[in-house]
Amino acid sequence: MAVKDFKPSILEAQAAEVAGVLRAIANERRLMILCKLVEWREASVSSLADAVGLSQSALSQHLAKMRSEGLVAYRRESQTLWYRIADARIERLFATLHRLFCVTNNKRR
């Protein structure tokens, strides 16, 4: 979207939802959890805990916050919980974040 096409009045109706999403991802650990879920598509709690360096208990607290905002969903397979991104907009948001912050030729302007 070009800056000239930016219309804050359109965002106003969605401001509460957007603020909730931004609050939910405004944590380094949750950012990395979501990055792993975007990369892997689905992951067990134990594999996520290992990947992001958290105890399963701490990870579960982060996942609960993200579940309450509708960012992640899970399915149970026997005793294992498998998490995934619940909203395709989150995948697109992370693709944009990756493009803006992780691609080596992008520098702060």
Indicate residue ranges for each PLM-predicted region.
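Alpha-helical DNA-recognition elements
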Residues: 65
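Residues in the helix-turn-helix
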Residues: 58
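Short, hydrophobic secondary-structure boundary micro-motifs
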Residues: 45-46, 75, 93, 109
